[in-house]
Amino acid sequence: MAKETINKDIINIVNKYKEEIKKKYNITEIILFGSYAKGTENEDSDIDIAIVSDDFDDIYECMAVLMGMTWNIDARIEPHPILKEDYENVSNPFVKEIIETGIKVA
């Protein structure tokens, strides 16, 4: 279950990252998931962000680009690019976890 309120610093980080992503990719959804969405984060937690788009031709190349975008924002960001068609496959356990526990930010 998603946490009711998220730390304002995390929201600001996610929003800055969202704006950077939108400069390069046509985004369907951006979802914060993992420990920050569940409220179970600790000082070593990364900031898991699912990025759903049809623009990801080469998922590994996109991952490298998305990781590069984190450098000037926050090193804890862990981007997870997902093709829209894969995100619509709710039988995928990873996608199911994002849908059930994630918080949509775009």
Task: Please report, for each region that a protein language model flagged, where it lies by residue.
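Catalytic core of pol beta-like nucleotidyltransferases
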Residues: 1-29, 38-43, 54-106
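Short hydrophobic/aromatic beta-strand micro-patches
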Residues: 50-52
